[in-house]
């Protein structure tokens, strides 16, 4: 515990091993079989328990939970472990759970990784180096992730899947199979199915104008001619419909993104 900076409200169990220059913030809880290597920093409210090792220069943000038992019914309190390498950034509410008897008794994370808010790494996962998991990525058990892989926010990966090196998974993607190295995987994006007619009715919009606006967007997104011409034609045709005019104004504004594709 040489030169370590430990807040007075932190709870560190007897037996925990701390390296040099470890910083432990307010209300952190450290179990008796935890090893924190040199220059590890726990911001506050971090819970690390079980047989867990955190590599040097790793920074863990508030409310992260590392080394808790796996979420499986057949877990029988076996002495499994969680090993996290060096130079990792583990943001708020990340959970990394210990291994199980059916997966080698260890969950392992490599070096130089970024795990954004709310990431879940399930039991027996093996994560490589230099990966990026965006917000709320969820990995089930027994998943292997290769070096330099990127997983977009709110994506979920099925148990036992393999994510190859240098691959990328787009946001909101349910991944139920292996992803090859260098592969690009993405789920179907949200599509425009019509107008929020029920919500518009509840807010007092005129029903006739709302239905007319629905017809107008069908003409804009699936009519003949190019998109700009269709917008102009619809603006002229429905110039007395305030709902359509509001939509047209939105379509004519500058944007760095495309519009959601229309599917009736």
Swiss-Prot record:
It is an enzyme of class 2 (transferase). It is found in: Cytoplasm. It catalyses: a (3R)-hydroxyacyl-[ACP] + UDP-N-acetyl-alpha-D-glucosamine = a UDP-3-O-[(3R)-3-hydroxyacyl]-N-acetyl-alpha-D-glucosamine + holo-[ACP]. GO terms for biological process: lipid A biosynthetic process. Pathway: Glycolipid biosynthesis; lipid IV(A) biosynthesis; lipid IV(A) from (3R)-3-hydroxytetradecanoyl-[acyl-carrier-protein] and UDP-N-acetyl-alpha-D-glucosamine: step 1/6. GO terms for cellular component: cytoplasm; membrane. Its EC number is 2.3.1.129. Keywords: Acyltransferase, Cytoplasm, Lipid A biosynthesis, Lipid biosynthesis, Lipid metabolism, Repeat, Transferase. NCBIfam families: lipid_A_lpxA, PRK05289.1. Involved in the biosynthesis of lipid A, a phosphorylated glycolipid that anchors the lipopolysaccharide to the outer membrane of the cell. Belongs to the transferase hexapeptide repeat family. LpxA subfamily. Homotrimer. This is Acyl-[acyl-carrier-protein]--UDP-N-acetylglucosamine O-acyltransferase. It comes from Rickettsia africae (strain ESF-5). The gene is lpxA.
């Amino acid at each position: 515990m040489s030169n370590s900076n430990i807040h007075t409200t932190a709870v560190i169990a007897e037996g925990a091993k701390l390296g040099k220059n470890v910083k432990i913030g307010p209300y952190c809880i450290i179990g008796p079989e935890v090893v924190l290597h040199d220059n590890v920093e726990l911001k506050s409210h971090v819970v690390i328990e079980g047989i867990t090792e955190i590599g040097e220069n790793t920074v863990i943000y508030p409310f992260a939970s590392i080394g808790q038992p796996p979420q499986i019914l057949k877990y029988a309190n076996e002495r499994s472990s969680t090993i996290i390498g060096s130079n990792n950034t583990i943001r708020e509410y990340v959970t990394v759970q210990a291994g199980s008897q059916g997966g080698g008794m260890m969950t392992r994370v490599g070096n130089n990784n970024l795990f954004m808010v709310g990431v879940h790494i399930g039991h027996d996962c093996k994560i490589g180096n230099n990966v990026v998991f965006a917000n709320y990525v969820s990995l089930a058990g027994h998943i292997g992730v290769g070096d330099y892989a990127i997983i977009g926010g709110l994506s979920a990966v099925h148990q036992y899947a393999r994510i190859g090196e240098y691959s990328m998974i787009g946001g909101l993607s349910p991944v139920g199979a292996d992803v090859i190295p260098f592969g690009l995987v993405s789920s179907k994006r949200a599509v425009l199915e019509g107008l929020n007619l029920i919500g518009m009715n509840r807010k007092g919009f005129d029903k006739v104008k709302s239905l007319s606006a629905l017809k107008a967007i069908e003409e804009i997104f699936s009519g003949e001619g190019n998109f700009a011409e269709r917008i102009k034609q619809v603006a002229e045709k429905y110039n007395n419909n305030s709902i359509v005019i509001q939509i047209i104004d939105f379509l004519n504004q500058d944007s760095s993104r495309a519009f959601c594709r229309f599917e009736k």
